[in-house]
């Protein structure tokens, strides 16, 4: 059997809810028991009086039995000397369980076996591991078992969101060689269904979507995520469907020919296929990377190039109006570019840079080569905004290697040139037009840094936000583009291999809805910094770190992406930031490494094969001027059983698909239709499961759903409550538009965290949390906590992190010693709230809290690239109300603003089902 998961251990009895049964929590994928660290004694900040299961890390069933554990963590011994003051209230009454939504006590094994037996299911923990089926025994292996659960009596446990997707169970001998890397790891490609229906009618009956979530790169730099590179330029492709040879082809005719696993055509094996070009001797075919690895990169020969590989080109369009000078953007960005010149990829020494400054005129800069007689940069001003022209086309884009010193001199002077400006104009649309003229012959990236609404020249926009329409049906109009220039110009850019990235910093309305069209159709991204000001150290540091990471990341250039599949399957719809050049070809002037794409798959003909394959290919030029093709091949079993389809469905991939659908609906029809569609879909899935797989009605009015999809209704509720979609009259349009950009571009792990943030209880962390793991050296995070105020105790300290923003929540009754240890302050009243960085103190608790905050920001460990460094806000429960309410919107299981609580949501779904 091919390896079921890239790097994930095969799971026995996948998806059984953890925290509801006593058996083997370890098998359920929860954290291991803490390692002992030299007998270090842990401070306990929660006193004896509150030790009755009301804390965040208490068991889901409320009170734990004596010596019980939750999530594999032993009960914490209390250290002396941190007695909790008694507040007069009975601590056991502090967190009444929500009515009708209390977790059951762990049932006895016999009782559970009986219950599962009644449903025709054996308890997965009691079953022996499934033997791998032999080819002779059964042509089709047993796919994942369906484990029904009741969403009302067994509430969702946040730890389930960290489970890997259901295993991909392939028949033995599916891959040509038995390689553990033959199938694509979920890090790169995830399917919403890990068992594919053989017919369109079965897919339609399931009501589940069939789509791929594709993230071709796992990091911003090759060194952090290495895949096998095949340098010999021998690329074997199917003559008919143009698929690349991969681990799932079949060799015939003594290995001289191969049968395509997509369309069944027989092809000749190229003559040089078994020759090692480096050592100039015959090679062992069984060792070829393209036959052993699902993810490979081919160095492309000449025929894959329309023109010589383009150099990396960055053209910076910098707002130099009054707003940009006063908030410090001009000075900070100039300094940051200067300090990052060393990090910009330039291995082939062809990288070119250009600069245009923008106010009510366009200011071009001619930068001479290093060592020239006159090393001063020249500024050329063009005030014709309708037909902006290039004053001296030759000297405006300069080679970084040849002009490095003079570029640094220019960046030092740039701030001084405009420091006394009073100009409020911003002709950014005209600057984009001029920039396009400058780099269209070679292609490249236009990086816009702006603090103003473009108010004159091409693409001029007006202040159209109206607080009276926020939260009403008219609000959706504000999310539409106000000027057609931004869409039509973006398409022009795409055709000329020009990509646009927007860095937006206004404290006023900036029309992110219109401006974000440029990145959307050119493979770029919109980075939004509301209320940014360089005078706040935290703001300046965040932007500097992110922009430096942005400039250093290894992007692909002049790229196209295509997905091919087994005969009978067709890629029908594509979601993400690119231009759809033809029915199945997505064009990227620049290919970023911090975005994901969703492709919907249609079943046009009945599939007769036991396995289908889908192959993603990204043809691109590396920053070093090499033409390459990255190929990712995913094989999935097929099934005629609806139970198999449901048992192998991936809740996180499904949530990602519906996130993209919801953004499309919000921009097309409005926010209310988008929210209604999500609720209707949740009801439809629950009703379908009840009717088709749970035997119609369920006694006792439960809400049945498979264990592997238990998080889906919660993720739908969290998506409806996300900043981009939730019903509220308090959300500025720019904030909402920026959130919609994230919902349609974030890689899957970051998207799930953005929809359902992570919350960690820090005052009662397990002993090993915040310290390096003895085996891996990685910092251990505490177990995550459900996003409900019922999990928050008044004496607690919590980290809430959605990947974009972090909140450090300080309870109103936090003990003084906790404040001393973490913040170095004698009294909570002296604790400043808002954006800040934690002080670095010489004590165990401070170091561990800092380590957890930093580890929670680490996107590399989540298997994806990102430049984002979240702000940390300190929030006091009894502090500034606005900040507190903002942090509380993260608790998506609570009732807030105009949204229902999880209990109400489940009740609504149950009524509608």
UniProtKB/Swiss-Prot annotation:
- Compositional bias of type Low complexity: which residue ranges? 1-37
The annotated region (Zinc finger-like) lies at: 238-263
Query: Coiled-coil segments, which residues?
Result: none
Keyword field contains Nucleotide-binding: no
Asked if the Swiss-Prot or TrEMBL record annotates the protein with the keyword Transport, the reply is yes
Which amino acids does the record list as binding Zn(2+)? 238, 241, 260, 263
Alphabetical keyword list: Cytoplasm, Cytoplasmic vesicle, Endoplasmic reticulum, ER-Golgi transport, Golgi apparatus, Membrane, Metal-binding, Protein transport, Transport, Zinc
Give a GO cellular-component term: Golgi membrane
Name the Gene Ontology biological process terms. Answer: COPII-coated vesicle cargo loading; intracellular protein transport
Mode of membrane association: Peripheral membrane protein
Query: Which intervals of the chain are annotated as region Disordered?
Result: 1-44
CDD domains referenced in this protein's UniProt entry, alphabetically: Sec24-like (cd01479)
Q: Read off the SUPFAM superfamilies from this record.
A: beta-sandwich domain of Sec23/24 (SSF81995), C-terminal, gelsolin-like domain of Sec23/24 (SSF82754), Helical domain of Sec23/24 (SSF81811), vWA-like (SSF53300), Zn-finger domain of Sec23/24 (SSF82919)
What domain of life does the native source organism fall in? Eukaryota
**GO MF annotations in UniProt:** SNARE binding; zinc ion binding
Location in the cell: Cytoplasm; Cytoplasmic vesicle, COPII-coated vesicle membrane; Endoplasmic reticulum membrane; Golgi apparatus membrane
Purpose of the protein? Component of the coat protein complex II (COPII) which promotes the formation of transport vesicles from the endoplasmic reticulum (ER). The coat has two main functions, the physical deformation of the endoplasmic reticulum membrane into vesicles and the selection of cargo molecules.
Family label: Belongs to the SEC23/SEC24 family. SEC24 subfamily.
Oligomer status and interactors: The COPII coat is composed of at least 5 proteins: the sec23/24 complex, the sec13/31 complex, and the protein sar1. Golgi apparatus membrane; Peripheral membrane protein; Cytoplasmic side.
The name under which this protein is listed is Protein transport protein sec24
> Which organism does this record belong to?
Aspergillus oryzae (strain ATCC 42149 / RIB 40) (Yellow koji mold)
The gene name reads sec24
């Amino acid at each position: 059997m091919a390896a079921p998961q890239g790097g994930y251990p095969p799971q026995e009895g996948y998806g059984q809810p953890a925290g509801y049964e006593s058996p083997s929590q370890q098998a359920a994928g929860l954290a291991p028991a803490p390692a002992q660290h030299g007998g270090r004694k842990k401070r306990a900040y929660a006193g004896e009086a509150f030790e009755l299961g009301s804390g965040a890390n208490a068991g889901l069933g409320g009170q734990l039995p004596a010596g019980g554990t939750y999530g594999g963590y032993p009960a914490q011994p209390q250290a002396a000397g941190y007695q909790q003051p008694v507040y007069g209230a009975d601590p056991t009454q502090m967190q009444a369980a929500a009515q009708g939504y209390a977790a059951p006590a762990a049932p006895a094994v016999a009782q559970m076996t009986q219950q599962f037996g009644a449903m025709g299911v054996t308890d997965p923990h009691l079953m022996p591991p499934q033997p791998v089926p032999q080819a002779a025994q059964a042509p089709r292996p047993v796919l994942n078992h369906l484990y029904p659960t009741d969403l009302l009596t067994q509430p969702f446990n946040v730890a389930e969101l960290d489970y890997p997707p259901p295993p991909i169970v392939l028949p033995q001998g599916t891959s040509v060689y038995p390689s553990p890397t033959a199938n694509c790891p979920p890090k790169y490609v995830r399917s919403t269904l890990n068992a594919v229906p053989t017919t369109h009618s079965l897919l339609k009956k399931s009501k589940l979507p069939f789509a791929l979530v594709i993230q071709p790169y796992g990091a911003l730099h090759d060194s952090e995520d290495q895949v096998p590179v095949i340098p010999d330029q021998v690329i074997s492709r199917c003559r008919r469907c143009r698929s690349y040879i991969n681990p799932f082809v079949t060799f015939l005719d003594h290995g001289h020919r191969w049968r395509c696993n997509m369309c069944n055509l027989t092809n000749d094996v190229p003559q040089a296929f078994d020759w090692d070009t480096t050592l100039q001797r015959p090679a062992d075919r069984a060792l070829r990377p393209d036959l052993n690895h699902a993810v490979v990169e081919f160095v492309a020969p000449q025929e894959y190039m329309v023109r010589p590989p383009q150099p990396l080109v960055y053209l910076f369009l910098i707002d130099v109006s009054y707003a940009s000078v006063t908030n410090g953007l001009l000075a900070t960005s100039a300094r940051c570019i200067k300090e990052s010149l060393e990090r910009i990829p330039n291995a082939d020494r062809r990288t070119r840079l250009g600069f245009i400054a923008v106010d009510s005129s366009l200011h071009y800069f001619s930068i001479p080569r290093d060592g020239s007689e006159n090393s001063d940069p020249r500024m050329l001003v063009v005030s014709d905004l309708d037909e902006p022209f290039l004053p001296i086309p030759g000297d405006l884009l300069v080679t970084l290697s040849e002009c490095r010193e003079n570029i640094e001199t220019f960046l030092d002077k740039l701030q001084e040139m405009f420091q006394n400006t009073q100009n409020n104009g911003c002709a950014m649309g005209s600057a984009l037009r001029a920039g396009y003229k400058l780099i269209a012959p070679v292609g490249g990236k236009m990086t816009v840094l702006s603090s103003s609404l473009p108010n004159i020249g091409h693409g001029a926009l007006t202040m159209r936000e109206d607080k009276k329409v926020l939260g009403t049906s008219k609000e959706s109009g504000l999310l539409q583009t106000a000027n057609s220039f931004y869409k039509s110009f973006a398409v022009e850019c795409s055709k000329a291999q020009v990509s646009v990235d927007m860095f937006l910093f206004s404290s006023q309305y900036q029309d992110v809805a219109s401006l974000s069209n440029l990145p959307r159709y050119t493979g770029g991204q919109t980075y939004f910094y509301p209320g940014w000001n360089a005078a706040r150290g935290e703001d300046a540091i965040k932007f500097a770190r992110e922009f430096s990471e942005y400039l250093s990341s290894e992007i692909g250039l002049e790229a196209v992406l295509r997905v091919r599949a087994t005969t009978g399957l067709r890629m029908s719809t594509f979601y993400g930031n690119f231009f759809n050049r033809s029915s199945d070809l997505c064009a990227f002037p620049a290919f970023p490494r911090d975005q994901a794409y969703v492709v919907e798959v249609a079943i046009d003909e009945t599939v007769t094969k036991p396995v289908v394959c889908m192959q993603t290919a990204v043809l691109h030029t590396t920053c070093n001027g090499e033409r390459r093709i990255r190929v990712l091949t995913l094989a999935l079993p097929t099934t005629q059983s609806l139970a198999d389809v449901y048992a192998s469905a991936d809740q996180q991939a499904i949530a990602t698909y519906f996130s993209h659908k919801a953004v499309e609906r919000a921009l097309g029809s409005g926010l209310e239709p988008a929210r209604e569609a999500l609720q209707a879909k949740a009801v439809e899935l629950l009703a379908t499961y009840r009717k088709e797989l749970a035997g119609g009605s369920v006694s006792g009015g439960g809400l049945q759903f498979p264990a592997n999809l238990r998080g889906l209704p919660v993720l739908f509720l969290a998506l409806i409550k996300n900043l981009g979609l939730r019903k509220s009259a308090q959300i500025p349009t720019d904030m909402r538009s920026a959130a919609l950009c994230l919902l349609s571009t974030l890689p899957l792990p970051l998207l799930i965290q953005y929809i359902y943030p992570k919350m960690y209880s820090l005052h009662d962390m397990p002993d090993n949390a915040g310290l390096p793991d003895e085996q891996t050296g990685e910092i251990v995070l505490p177990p995550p906590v459900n996003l409900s105020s019922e999990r928050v105790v008044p004496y607690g300290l919590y980290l809430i992190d959605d990947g974009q923003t972090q909140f450090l929540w300080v309870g109103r009754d936090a003990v003084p010693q906790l404040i001393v240890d973490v913040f170095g302050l004698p009294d909570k009243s002296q604790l400043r709230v808002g954006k800040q960085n934690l002080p670095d103190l010489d004590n165990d608790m401070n170091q561990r809290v800092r380590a957890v905050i930093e580890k929670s920001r680490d996107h590399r460990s989540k298997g994806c690239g990102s430049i984002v460094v979240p702000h940390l806000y300190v929030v006091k429960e009894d502090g500034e109300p606005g900040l507190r309410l903002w942090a509380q919107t993260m608790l998506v299981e609570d009732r807030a603003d105009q949204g229902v609580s999880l209990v109400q949501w489940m009740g609504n779904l149950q009524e509608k089902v």
